[in-house]
Amino acid sequence: MKYEALLHRLKPFGITGIVYDSREAGPGKIFACIRGEHCDGHDYIDAALQRGTRVILCDHIVEKDVYQIVVKDVRAFMGELAAAICNNPDEQLLMIGITGTNGKTTSAYITRSILQAADIPCGLIGTVVYHDGLR
C-alpha cells in the first residue's frame, strides 16, 4: 500500500505526525514501537494511549484496542510515513553537490552566497559546520 493511500485511510484520526517516544505521543500522533538494544517501544503502548494516541506502528499485532499498522521494519516504514505525512518535502529540494580535491569549502560558500543574494533559501552541510538556511 502506498503511504498516501494509508494516510487517506487514517484521515479520521487527524494524523499530524509520528513519534517513537511515548512522552511525545498524543492526539494526531502515530506512536512507532521501535525495538532498541535496551528498550522495546511495544512496552510503552499503554503510556502512548494514555496520552491520546489512537494509532500505533508496530512489528506484530498487539492485544490492544487501538488502530494498528503492522509492518516488518518499523524504523524504515516510520521514515517513509513521516515524509508522506509532511507531504514529501524532500521532493521539493534542489541539491547541489561539490566534489574534488581542493576548493570544496570555498566553492560551497561562494555558491551559498550567490543563492542568498538572489533570495533563494540555501542550507549548507560541510565537514565542520552546517546551516539549515533558516538561522
Feature-to-residue mapping (PLM):
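N-terminal leader/targeting and accessory segments in enzymes
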Residues: 1-80, 84
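Phosphate-binding loop of NTP-binding sites
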Residues: 77-135
